[in-house]
Amino acid sequence: EGLGKVLRYGAYDDEVLARLRWMEKTLAPALSRALAAHGPLDLRSLIAQALQMGDEVHNRNRAATSLLIRALAPHLVRTGADADETAAVLRFLDGNDHFFLNLSMAASKCSLDPAAGIPGSSMIAVMARNGTDFGIQVAALPGRWFTAPAPMVDGLYLPGFTAADAAPDIGDSVITETAG
């Protein structure tokens, strides 16, 4: 979805819904075709390169997103429904520096899951926030949550909003911080 006026930040209007519908009807099928043509993506390699380029693949994903576009662009062009649609998909990806975040989150979770159940391990294997609680799971104790109240975030707000409008910390992307 990107940054700014998006559903995950609490925005919900016709513009947000139109973008989500476009993502469902146009972006997802285009990416599906391109991925089928490309074959499996080596996310570990993309992340390693992005880290060397200054990303930390949570709040900064510019390099990782650019590397992803570089990998998929030829396949988007080759499998695209038409030139205008392909151009719109590439513009969306290019204008969304956070596009890689979802892939980073999945890669982080997959890399951490094998740690679950290692006897005696004090490694933090999961961190999560749901707007009410902040929780962790320790590798030696899979499935057992240690929780505390989710803190309020001192962050930036969309125009017209203040800290009084905010909810406590929420989101699954903290799994990237768990992975380091």
Regions found by a protein language model. Give the residues of each.
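Accessory "access/gating" subregions that flank catalytic or transport cores
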Residues: V57-P168
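Conserved phosphate/anionic-ligand binding catalytic regions in large, soluble enzymes, centered on
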Residues: D169-A179
